[in-house]
């Protein structure tokens, strides 16, 4: 459990917090683990965080773009949540809007973790402005800019420092106090922003307060689009949940169900799962979600892009309507907005950066090289030789065949290894472990690894082939420049990619990057097709109605968008036709132009 260990039920001192006004001190209730505050001169105690009277600021009760708040607000006795701890929802998990509070006793179980202000050396407005934080919602707590200010148990704070983190990232700083109040959240932030710990840390505290019998099912459920991201989330949960003594299992396709079912039968607090595999196990009646009170949708935009919406909605129907729901996404298209409106109640939206346009990480230096296809091999070798030996580098290819071919050519001199959908789970795990350890410092991958792959110290990303859409480009290069580090991205761009030229120019300009003259010329000649549509392909399209054959989203057979409702595997595509772990035959509708993708009636997912 995520508790503060103490020899008795008496209070103990909280970690030193230099932002507290003197002479106030933080104390931890030895029974509940709540943080409260004590003035040794007056012997007053209170849950509200004390603020200097000279610059106390009241929290606005209206929606705000940059939020300012300064103290814990105890819920009034008139505010009550449902008896089982959640907002009122309809029978189909459709929102039944209610002003009721979340806990039946009239107080929040997270009072001690409420709106803890930022340090006196920087105003909350300045912090939000500097980190491009905007918040929509009423009575939103101020960001927590230090681990000590969070009120997390000292063991968790110690683990964060031991992992090399000096302070919360912006998404953590703003989302933690909201989540700790038990509220629903939509958090929109770029990849590499620290979102995983943004929801895991409050999950540990949630477990401390509301842990159920793990033999009867999990308390925490995290849904993830890919097995790679799911296993990484599990690793983070185990790493930072040691002091909380949590049990966590991971459910994903492409691996035998037996070991996963055995772990479930032993009882777990947290389940991290891909939607397809979890649906399989639900249909087998081998897991119950009836105790889940904390639900996370990680990379929600990617899950919808991959067509998981039917599976997600089916899963959510198995989860109690009285729950806390957190949705994390890198982008904010219409589909994500719709499912957020359906599944979340009175949510607070936290934005890091501009969510209305696709923005690349500005800490990544992007080099676009307009080259002929036959020049790519020579150029990639030049780039690899120019880097420090042992530097971790990811090279993205558009097809499995090219991925294998390129890795074979680079293995001898550069220690390259390949990962794609035809690799077994064991092969993938081995290649990733070798890459993480630096024994195979060059990873050649298809887009199966483009989202959710969280490996530290990736110095360079090379786009050997340009992806099928500008969104995937941004997510690919986002493998480097993570957690505040700088990164390099090289992209080979050919005439066959000219339809993406205008969109690429916009991304480069938005990140203050140099735009090559040749690329700008391509865009001026009409490349990109971006003027007739937005980034989400909402313009007129073919049978799928999703923006025509150049839309970067995935389109199933007969215009269907995504995976089959009856899919049996987390990686099966369309009407049960796509399986990332089995060899696939090429469709006869494949265009002879390699760069043109699939026709409008077929899936354009090439991995």
UniProtKB/Swiss-Prot annotation:
Q: Where is the composition biased (Gly residues)?
A: 538-548
Task: List its EC numbers.
Answer: 3.6.4.13
Pfam families named in the record: DEAD, Helicase_C, WW
Presence of keyword Cytoplasm: no
Region span, Disordered: 1-25, 66-108, 519-607
Domain Helicase ATP-binding, by residue range, is 176-350
Record domain Helicase C-terminal: where: 379-523
What is the native source organism of this protein?
Answer: Nicotiana sylvestris (Wood tobacco)
For binding ATP, which residues are annotated in this chain's numbering? 189-196
InterPro entries from the UniProt entry: DEAD/DEAH_box_helicase_dom, Helicase_ATP-bd, Helicase_C-like, P-loop_NTPase, RNA-helicase_DEAD-box_CS, RNA_helicase_DEAD_Q_motif, WW_dom, WW_dom_sf
Enumerate the SUPFAM superfamilies for this protein. P-loop containing nucleoside triphosphate hydrolases, WW domain
Instruction: Please state which protein family the record places this protein in.
Output: Belongs to the DEAD box helicase family.
Name of this chain's protein? ATP-dependent RNA helicase-like protein DB10
| Reaction catalysed by this enzyme | ATP + H2O = ADP + phosphate + H(+)
């Amino acid at each position: 459990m995520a508790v503060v260990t103490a020899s008795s039920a008496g209070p103990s001192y909280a970690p030193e917090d230099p932002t507290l006004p003197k002479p106030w001190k933080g104390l931890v209730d030895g029974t509940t683990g709540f943080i409260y505050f004590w003035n040794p001169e007056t012997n007053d105690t209170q849950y509200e965080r004390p603020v200097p009277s000279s610059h106390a600021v009241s929290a606005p009760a209206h929606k705000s773009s940059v939020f300012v708040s300064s103290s814990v607000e105890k819920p009034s006795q008139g505010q009550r949540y449902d008896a089982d701890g959640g907002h009122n929802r309809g029978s189909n998990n459709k929102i039944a809007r209610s002003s009721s509070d979340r806990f039946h006793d009239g107080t929040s179980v997270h009072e001690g973790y409420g709106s803890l202000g930022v340090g006196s050396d920087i105003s909350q407005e300045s912090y939000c402005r500097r980190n491009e934080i905007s918040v929509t919602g009423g009575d939103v707590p101020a960001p927590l800019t230090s681990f000590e200010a969070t009120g997390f148990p000292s063991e968790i704070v110690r683990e964060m420092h031991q992992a090399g983190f000096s302070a919360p990232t912006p998404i953590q700083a703003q989302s933690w106090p909201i989540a700790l109040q038990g509220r629903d959240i939509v958090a929109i932030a770029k990849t590499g922003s620290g979102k995983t710990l943004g929801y895991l840390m409050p999950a540990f505290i949630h477990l401390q307060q509301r842990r159920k019998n793990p033999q009867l099912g999990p308390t925490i459920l995290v849904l993830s689009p890919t097995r790679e991201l799911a296993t990484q989330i599990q690793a983070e949960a185990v790493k930072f949940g040691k002091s909380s003594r949590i049990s966590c299992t991971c459910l994903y396709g492409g691996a035998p169900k037996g070991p996963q079912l055995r772990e479930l039968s032993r009882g777990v607090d947290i389940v991290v799962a891909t939607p397809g595999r979890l649906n399989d196990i639900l249909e087998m009646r081998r897991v119950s979600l009836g105790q889940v009170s904390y639900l996370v949708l990680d990379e929600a935009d990617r899950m919808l892009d991959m067509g998981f919406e039917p599976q997600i909605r089916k899963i959510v129907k198995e989860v109690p309507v009285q729950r806390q729901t957190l949705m994390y996404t890198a982008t904010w298209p219409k589909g994500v907005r719709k499912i957020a409106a359906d599944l979340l109640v009175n949510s607070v939206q936290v934005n890091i950066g501009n969510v209305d346009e696709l923005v690349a990480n500005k800490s990544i230096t992007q080099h676009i090289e307009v080259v002929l296809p036959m020049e790519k091999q020579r150029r990639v070798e030049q780039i690899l030789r120019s880097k420090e030996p042992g530097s971790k580098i990811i090279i993205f290819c558009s097809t499995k065949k090219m991925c294998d071919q390129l890795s074979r050519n680079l293995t001898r001199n550069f220690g390259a290894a390949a990962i794609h959908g035809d690799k077994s789970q064991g092969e993938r795990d081995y290649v990733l472990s070798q890459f993480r350890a630096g024994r195979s410092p060059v990873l050649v991958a298809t887009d199966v690894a483009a989202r959710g792959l969280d490996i530290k110290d990736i110095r360079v990303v090379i786009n050997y082939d340009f992806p099928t859409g500008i969104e995937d480009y941004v997510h690919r290069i986002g493998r480097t420049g993570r957690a505040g580090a700088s990164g390099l991205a090289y992209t080979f761009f050919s005439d066959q990619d000219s339809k993406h030229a205008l969109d690429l120019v916009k991304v480069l300009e938005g990140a203050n990057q140099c735009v090559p003259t040749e690329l700008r010329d391509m865009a001026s000649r009409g490349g990109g097709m971006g003027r007739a549509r937005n980034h989400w392909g909402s313009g007129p399209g073919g049978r799928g109605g999703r923006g025509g054959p150049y839309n970067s989203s995935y389109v199933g057979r007969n215009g269907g968008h995504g995976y089959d409702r009856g899919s049996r595997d987390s990686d099966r595509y369309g009407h049960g036709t796509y399986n990332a772990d089995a060899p696939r035959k090429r469709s006869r509708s494949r265009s002879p132009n390699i760069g043109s993708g699939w026709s409008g009636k077929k899936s354009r997912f090439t991995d």
